């Protein structure tokens, strides 16, 4: 793993977030390098903003921080913290960092987009830009070649403007989009659907995990959320749209429910869904943070967790391990962690090593629900 990005006689020290003792993954990729090289000789107006969308750990934000008026747009708390940490480590000026639901600055001169794999998020961002961009604004997307599909280009062409691609360099490609304001359409509402067997209706912003239907892991976990007056404080860790936390709130009306996610869109969806589905929405609070970093130790009786297995576009199991470790810290003595996981992931070994005990409380062909007690 290279800790430094060196281009054009300039070096940036860049780390992923959070920093781990042994790191095998870089904080930037070939698509970042391609964007930097392509824009190196561009003349930029220091007064007009440039927008950087989906900058994983701040490589692009750091590169342009001294050169332009930068606004970075991200749905990820982890990406935001990584960007801030890398700006600080390289003694660079701060940049404006906003989430995907915030209003974008007007009259940008350049938009750089790390193209997301999630087509719903890409569509949302393209439509948001189409309402905003002046005709002279240059828009350049970038991603690995394998992640730029015909469907990706069709979305760009449909929702923002005429789209062309570059040659591939180091297995990365650029996408050039000419803004066309006549394509502007009303911004789409959050996707809504029902979970009829539980009497829950869910609204999902564009980047919420499994935002078009209930994922099969959550469907199993919903049937095994415990009910007991001993639970005063319950955490839904990696809450997504909040369906697990909402079910826990209904089964345990005496409990305070804290839903946690690193996605700003997830937390917003969760808050909206609590208002839609709970008689006392104030019972549930949604917060955006990295796992349970901002939760007081020994403050919870029950943690419910459906861990992700990727960070940004990278598949990794360290997030699940971090979630389990954080859960142990925030649980009170005799507090319980209930986890749903694909049976191939082997969470039982991790939980046994960490808690000293693990029990299978439910399973089907694909998933297992585990319980460990502190």
Curated annotation (Swiss-Prot):
SUPFAM superfamilies linked: S-adenosyl-L-methionine-dependent methyltransferases
Enzyme class at the top of the EC tree: transferase
Keyword 4Fe-4S: no
Cited InterPro entries: DNA_methylase_N6_adenine_CS (IPR002052), rRNA_m2G-MeTrfase_RlmG (IPR017237), RsmC/RlmG (IPR046977), SAM-dependent_MTases_sf (IPR029063), Small_mtfrase_dom (IPR007848)
Subcellular location(s) per record: Cytoplasm
Catalyzed chemical reaction(s): guanosine(1835) in 23S rRNA + S-adenosyl-L-methionine = N(2)-methylguanosine(1835) in 23S rRNA + S-adenosyl-L-homocysteine + H(+)
Lineage: superkingdom: Bacteria
CDD domains: AdoMet_MTases
Keywords assigned by UniProt, alphabetized: Cytoplasm, Methyltransferase, rRNA processing, S-adenosyl-L-methionine, Transferase
GO cellular component: cytoplasm
EC number of the protein: 2.1.1.174
GO molecular function terms listed in the Swiss-Prot or TrEMBL record: 23S rRNA (guanine(1835)-N(2))-methyltransferase activity; nucleic acid binding
UniProt KW Secreted keyword: no
Biological role: Specifically methylates the guanine in position 1835 (m2G1835) of 23S rRNA.
UniProt family annotation: Belongs to the methyltransferase superfamily. RlmG family.
Name assigned to this protein: Ribosomal RNA large subunit methyltransferase G
